[in-house]
């Protein structure tokens, strides 16, 4: 996996450095993005899983994304995220790949912008936990249909290079809430402390980081 990540970063860097556009604004045709940052998990699991044993431990996120712009304010793309959390010898990691729809607002002659993205794809979660005097540990792996939301701020640096501050939320394991209701039947607005939303999920990751974008 480390070799795959290294190879992917190399390919993206090579492709990015060979984009010969000299435009003095953010990409409006196509772009290649790679970056990373912190990953803040919120995972509810069973009594033996990584997060219940070690808490919602902070990890890191590595990401790559390709975008094709139909309009300066609208694009489609493909994004891949790799997340890793560890409390040695226990460790957990996640692979998530999905197509994205991106909406963007530009200003300052196209040199700055904000974006919002929505994606649905495949999420593969794996963890290995150990108990005392156990060498092999307990391996758990499961695939999910993941839903992601992203937003961020883009700024032009020079030529075909721009920077990006971004926030992504990755979610999975959604289910219908058995306690769901449309409205509070209590006329006084009493809050019973129970979540009555229609849908709930058990897996959420909040990723905050920085990325470099090459494109034209």
Region locations from a protein language model:
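Extracytoplasmic loops and strand-loop junctions of Gram-negative outer membrane beta-barrel proteins
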Residues: 46-49, 132-137, 189-195
